[in-house]
A protein has these predicted regions:
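Hydrophobic core segments of alpha-helical transmembrane domains in multi-pass membrane transport
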Residues: 56-67, 129-134, 212-214, 227-242, ...
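Extended, low-charge hydrophobic alpha-helical regions
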Residues: 71-112, 156, 177-189, 293-411
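Juxtamembrane inter-helical linkers in multi-pass membrane proteins
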Residues: 32, 82, 86-90, 143-173, ...
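Alpha-helical transmembrane helix bundles of large polytopic membrane transport and channel proteins
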Residues: 1-32
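Core alpha-helical transmembrane segments of integral membrane proteins
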Residues: 47-147
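Hydrophobic alpha-helical transmembrane segments of multi-pass integral membrane proteins
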Residues: 116-142, 149-175, 322-359
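Transmembrane helix-loop junctions at the membrane interface of multipass transporters and ion channels
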Residues: 202-225, 388-399, 418-428
Length: 428
């Protein structure tokens, strides 16, 4: 192990393959090597090299995020936002001309159009991000990422097998948690399940984009990358703690055959983008649609079901004020912030739609400062995933009590991290 830099099982596998190659080279007069394999070997010298693999991977991710959040995705999102605003104004004028009841008009314009529309504008960003990720997957590069990350993951108690569910976690936590079933070791599988929610899912992109556009417009990509890296860093710390305490032991061996590099299939990329867009639209017009209506109702009526002129007198404000003091050390003790985080438990996109409904057209900086916005972003990054992901964790662990404990732990980690960020920015 000391000589090869590999663990015992990997070293044995390497010796077997070396022996097989020596036998083949001595027996076969002329071994034909395909052009694709020769090209892949040359590319792997750079992409999986000992000193170049990690810098290249970080460079590729940096370029992907820059193109998504600062160039292509953001511009498309801005254009769509103009269209959504124009459509909302058109609906408003039409309902006013028709003389519809003001309460119903408020539901349609201030509730549904503002809430669902505020989430829809982030569809281009999500599609752009998955366009680049699907290309990386289809070329065979992501398989190299699993191979490259095996050694670093072993230092925190996991193997390269865990990287696949974690990478899926950047899309959605539900299939990522289900993908841990491919991890043979029960110890590794449970550790991976607990770490996967720290990989920021695509549903949170709308929150990040919403806040970075308002508070950090000139550093969008940098803030986005920082959030993703912070989630990974917290996951590493959590893995080290679990490896030293709850999940003592060694990770399972990891051996895989790397496929040749190939040009991405336009059909497979298009199918993946269609699936992501369809899933996003289904959530926008089902879960988020219903959540928006519920939020509008709670912020429009008081406890006696009378229409309120000021949402501060509403049912929603009453609920939010019970919880808001918990977030005072984080810089956002406003009841509207608390209720948006509660709605985020249903679906993370609901955080944006809830804030949009509660703001009533007012700018976001009336509720947040740059400092509290950064703290809020860190909290949304780390606190418990959506209810669908929690239900999946419950099914995989087979215990409601353990699931409740996991949710509370995630909320505590998020609260501590956000309070530290808020305090550090205050000092700086």
């Amino acid at each position: 192990e000391t000589e090869t830099g590999l663990d015992r099982n990997a070293a044995l596998a390497d010796m077997r393959y070396s022996f097989i190659e020596s036998v083949v080279s001595a027996s076969v007069v002329k071994c034909h090597e395909s052009r694709e394999h020769a090209r892949s070997v040359k590319m792997d010298r750079l992409l999986t090299g000992r000193y170049t693999a990690v810098p290249v991977f970080l460079g590729i991710m940096l370029l992907t995020f820059w193109l998504t959040f600062d160039v292509i995705g953001q511009r498309l999102s801005d254009w769509l936002a103009v269209g959504v605003d124009a459509l909302t104004a058109l609906v408003d004028r039409g309902l006013t001309a028709y003389g519809i009841n003001p309460v119903v008009k408020s539901l349609i314009v201030d509730g549904i159009c503002s809430g669902v529309g505020s989430v829809l504008v982030f569809l281009p960003i999500i599609v752009t991000l998955f366009f680049f990720l699907s290309i990386l997957e289809d070329t065979g590069y992501m398989a190299r990422v699993a191979f490259v990350m095996d050694k670093p993951l072993r230092k925190i108690g996991l193997s390269g097998r865990s990287i696949v569910p974690m990478l899926i976690g950047f899309g959605c936590s539900v299939p990522a948690i289900m993908a841990t079933r491919t991890v043979s070791s029960d110890r590794d599988r449970k550790m991976t399940i607990l770490l996967t929610p720290y990989m920021s899912c695509s549903a949170k992109i709308s929150i990040y984009a919403f806040f970075t556009a308002a508070f950090f417009p000139t550093h969008r990509a940098l803030v986005m990358i920082s959030l993703y890296l912070l989630g990974i860093l917290i996951g590493i710390v959590a893995a080290l703690i679990m490896n030293w305490s709850t999940f003592r032991g060694k990770p399972v061996p990891f051996v895989m055959e790397l496929p040749n590099y190939r040009l991405p299939s336009l059909k497979s990329v298009a199918l993946l983008l269609w699936e992501k867009a369809k899933d996003f639209l289904q959530r926008a017009f089902t879960v988020i649609f219903l959540a928006t209506i519920i939020i509008w109702f709670l912020q429009s009526f008081d406890i006696r079901l009378n229409v309120v002129a000021d949402s501060a007198d509403s049912l929603l404000a009453l609920i939010g004020r019970w919880i808001a003091p918990v977030f005072a050390p984080l810089g956002f003790a406003d009841w509207r912030c608390a209720t948006s985080l509660i709605s985020g438990f249903i679906a993370k996109e609901s955080v944006v739609s809830t804030l949009e409904v509660l703001l009533g057209g007012a700018p976001l900086f009336t509720m947040f400062t740059n400092r509290s916005a950064a703290s809020f972003l860190v909290f949304t990054l780390l606190y418990t995933p959506c209810i669908a992901a929690v239900a999946t964790i419950r099914r995989e662990f087979g215990s409601t009590l353990k699931t409740v404990g996991i949710v509370l732990m995630q909320c505590c980690v998020a609260w501590i991290a956000a309070s530290v960020v808020y305090a550090l920015i205050g000092i700086l």
